[in-house]
From Swiss-Prot:
Name of the protein in question: Chaperone protein DnaK
Modification type Phosphothreonine: residues: T199
Region (Disordered): 608-643
Inducers of expression: By stress conditions e.g. heat shock.
Positions with biased composition (Low complexity): 614-623
Organism of origin: Saccharophagus degradans (strain 2-40 / ATCC 43961 / DSM 17024)
Function field: Acts as a chaperone.
NCBIfam families assigned to the protein according to its UniProt record, in alphabetical order: PRK00290.1 (NF001413), PRK05183.1 (NF003520), prok_dnaK (TIGR02350)
UniProt entry tagged with the keyword Ribonucleoprotein: no
Family as reported in the entry's similarity comment: Belongs to the heat shock protein 70 family.
Length: 643
């Protein structure tokens, strides 16, 4: 069996590593560098350049040089953040047929995984040149906060590059592996703060010595998939462009060549300001107008840069608070803080992290290489070369299905250790319903439509039965890559349907980064939504039961009673269409009162034996579940309910 290589597929830079003996080794590329820029260029003569060679020619070929493409994986073209990026990058971002954000190069439409595959090919070749043998298997890292479709897209990129991706592993977890492998035995809790080129993750990880085995257990993870070094660069680019516009009245955003030069200068200035207090951005002949050539010369201090990016640094602190809370630990329980990702070299970032945790981050972990090294260690675990390591990772976001009233009912909660399998029994919403749609969602919001839709499928041929009677068992099975398989089974017939969630379309805006934050910020709105849905479900259950009572025993009611009940039903149906909780509760009360005299007659007539049926109108408000079925039912599947 050949070596399983470890690849850190980064937004800005990528890195490849293998395990030699019991140590992870980072492999230098053909240019002699330990990291490779995640940049792909398409030249006039049809050549594809990757890495440093692509970066070198970017200024003369800006429209066909693609960088930070990882930020587009799983994103919708209409996403606000993608729209903002469009004006900031010199290459063309377009809408694919499914609404995803793709890129266009020399008239060809390309999906982000295709571009990422070119970088992976370079990593594969780097490893092959060093090992002197063909490499076919890899462990690839992704941001911990990547959703299901983004993970699937990363696997697809590996496939395009000719790699069998044995495992998708979270970047902070990989860094913890690299850090913890050679540490003395004993238990410790560490925080991995990973601020890379395009994404931010925080993971709280417990490293324990269990029966001589190194156990790495992720307690919680959080993050923001649209926060990274590229955003720091963009703040600086915006500032430089604005200063130039003030002086010369020319907007450099309209000039791809100037924009590319600005990007390079901004990145260089940002790096210089990590070790010096001041630098000068000097770009002669940046553009020209009727009066002649124009030059950009701007003096930049570290303090100015810090004022431009302060909001970005602060944005990374909210996920820290959530991760600590979700892990069930306090800041004082954290033994070590590990910094990962090139952007953590910025003194302001280091100071903010040190202040939050009340201790200095460790300096003995290489922020550019730790992730790839951890991936190589995981590869060796999978191939059996390393036997004393157990890695327990988690799923970053809750997974569930949409149930009656548009509620997202979670089956697997966020921060659940994976792999895992969970089943729950649901039922139908209508009498004689013969099909249900299973709509799979990912996220923390109570309202299904506010979460990321991962896919939907139908379970048909359910035998006709009263609502609430069929037993439909929904099973979620999430593998060690964090990729989901969902099945639904009618327990009466044994008929089953399943779906492996595929990356059919990506995120609609910066959803994934906002999911948990939104859930917190919108907790009040979510609570009100839940209350409205509960009131509506109660009212609709009562309407259904009362109508049934009228049909079966309407002749027992006087004309006045019947008229009052029908009037109350009409009012209740109208109230159920709205969003007013108070109106629904009032309608429930009125309908209960209107039907109570008929219910009492039936009760008196039928005695104890008929109590269940007679009380239906009164008790429907409580909606008891049948045979353990959860009272969150499916809507009936509609023929036109396509994607």
């Amino acid at each position: 069996m050949g070596k399983i290589i470890g690849i850190d597929l980064g937004t800005t830079n990528s890195c490849v590593s293998i395990l030699e003996g019991n140590k992870a080794k980072v492999i230098e590329n053909s240019e002699g560098d330990r990291t490779t820029p995640s940049i792909v260029a398409f030249t006039e003569d049809g050549e594809i350049l990757v890495g440093q060679s692509a970066k070198r020619q970017a200024v003369t070929n800006p429209q066909n040089t693609l960088f930070a493409v990882k930020r587009l994986i799983g994103r919708k073209f209409t996403d606000d953040v993608v729209q903002k990026d469009i004006s900031m990058v010199p290459y063309k971002i377009i809408a694919a047929d499914n609404g995803d954000a793709w890129v266009e190069v020399k008239g060809d439409k390309k999906a982000p995984p295709q571009i990422s595959a070119e970088v992976l090919k370079k990593m594969k070749k780097t490893a092959e040149d060093y090992l002197g043998e063909t490499v076919t298997e890899a462990v690839i890292t992704v941001p911990a906060y990547f959703n299901d479709s983004q993970r699937q897209a990363t696997k697809d990129a590996g496939k395009i590059a000719g790699l069998d991706v044995k495992r998708i592993i979270n970047e902070p977890t990989a860094a913890a592996l690299a850090y913890g492998m050679d540490k003395s035995k004993g238990d410790s809790t560490i925080a991995v703060y990973d601020l890379g080129g395009g994404t931010f993750d925080i993971s709280i990880i417990e490293i324990a010595d269990v029966d001589g085995e190194h156990q790495f257990e992720v307690l919680s993870t959080n993050g923001d998939t649209f926060l990274g070094g590229e955003d720091f660069d963009l703040r600086l680019i915006e500032y430089l462009a604005e200063e130039f516009k003030k002086t010369n009245g020319i907007d450099l955003h309209n000039d791809p060549l100037a924009l590319q030069r600005l990007k390079e200068a901004a990145e260089k200035a940002k790096i210089e300001l990590s070790s010096s207090q001041q630098t000068e951005v000097n770009l002669p002949y940046i553009t020209a107008d009727a009066t002649g050539p124009k030059h950009l010369v701007v003096k930049l201090s570290r303090a100015k840069l810090e004022s431009l990016v302060e909001e970005l640094v602060n944005r990374s602190l909210e996920p820290l608070k959530m991760a600590i809370k979700d892990a069930g630990v306090s800041v004082s329980d954290i033994d070590d803080v590990i910094l990962v990702g090139g952007q953590t070299r910025m003194p302001m970032v280091q100071a903010a992290v040190a202040k939050f945790f009340g201790k200095e981050p460790r300096k003995d972990v290489n922020p550019d290489e730790a992730v790839a090294m951890g991936a190589a260690i995981q590869g060796a675990v999978l191939s059996g070369d390393v036997k004393d390591v157990l890695l327990l990772d988690v799923t970053p976001l809750s997974l569930g299905i949409e149930t009656m009233g548009g509620v997202a009912t979670p089956l697997i909660e966020k921060n659940t250790t994976i792999p895992t399998k969970k089943s729950q029994v649901f039922s139908t919403a209508d009498d004689n319903q013969t099909a249900v749609t299973i709509h799979v969602v990912q996220g923390e919001r109570k309202q299904a439509s506010q979460n990321k839709s991962l896919g939907r499928f139908d379970l048909a041929d359910i035998p006709p039965a009263p609502r609430g009677m069929p037993q439909i068992e929904v099973t979620f099975d999430i593998d060690a890559n964090g990729i989901l398989n969902v099945s639904a089974k009618d327990k009466a017939t044994g008929k089953e349907q399943s779906i492996v969630i595929k990356a059919s379309s990506g995120l609609s805006d910066d959803e994934i980064e906002k999911m948990v934050q939104d859930a917190e910020a919108n907790a009040d709105a979510d609570r009100k939504f839940e209350e409205v849905v509960t009131a509506r479900n109660t009212l609709e259950g009562l309407i259904h039961a009362t109508k049934k009572t009228l049909e079966e025993a309407g002749d027992k009611a006087t004309a006045d009673e019947k008229s009052a009940i029908e009037s109350a039903i009409a009012e209740a149906e109208e109230a159920a269409k709205g969003e007013d909780k108070d109106a629904m509760e009032a309608a429930t009360k009125k309908l209960t009162e209107a039907s109570s005299s008929l219910a009492q007659k039936l009760y008196a007539e039928q005695g104890a034996a008929g109590a269940g049926a007679a009380g239906a109108a009164d008790a429907a408000a409580d909606q008891p579940a049948d045979d353990g079925a959860v009272d969150a039912e499916f809507e009936e599947v509609k023929e036109d309910d396509g994607k």
